[in-house]
Amino acid sequence: MLILLMIKKIAQYCVSMGLIFLCLLAGINLQTWLGIAIPGSIIGLLILFGLMASGLVPVEWVKPSATLFIRYMILLFVPISVGLMVHFDTLLANLAPILASAIGGTLIVMVTLGLILDRMLKKGKKSCG
């Protein structure tokens, strides 16, 4: 009985990981085929989101591996952080534009989302009352 449960759990992880990697592969191939500047991983993420939002892929099918990726996400940033330290002098030389774009972009997103939410809430109140 325990072996069957283990096999079922392993199968769930395999299906989950397979779906995520198939969407990643589809995104990379689509990006290469179309020649657009959006990274293939982002396109794959949007494909996976679209499949889950439309109900073609139930969330439960993706959840095991997604939970695993989220749990160990910090480890995935270590190579990127080390790679940034190689170019520390370049980062330091461009610190002002980097900070300006990060802070400015954050403010633009916050204000835009605030305005959209405000309009949506006002429309919701008008239709209710």
From Swiss-Prot:
Regions crossing the membrane: 10-30, 33-53, 73-93, 97-117
Coiled-coil boundaries: none
UniProt xrefs under InterPro entries: LrgA/CidA, Uncharacterised_UPF0299
Gene Ontology CC: plasma membrane
Keywords from the UniProt entry: Cell inner membrane, Cell membrane, Membrane, Transmembrane, Transmembrane helix
Main subcellular location: membrane
Keyword Hydrolase: no
Locations listed in the record: Cell inner membrane
Membrane topology: Multi-pass membrane protein
Keyword hit for Cell membrane: yes
Family designation: Belongs to the UPF0299 family.
Protein name, UniProt field: UPF0299 membrane protein VC_1233
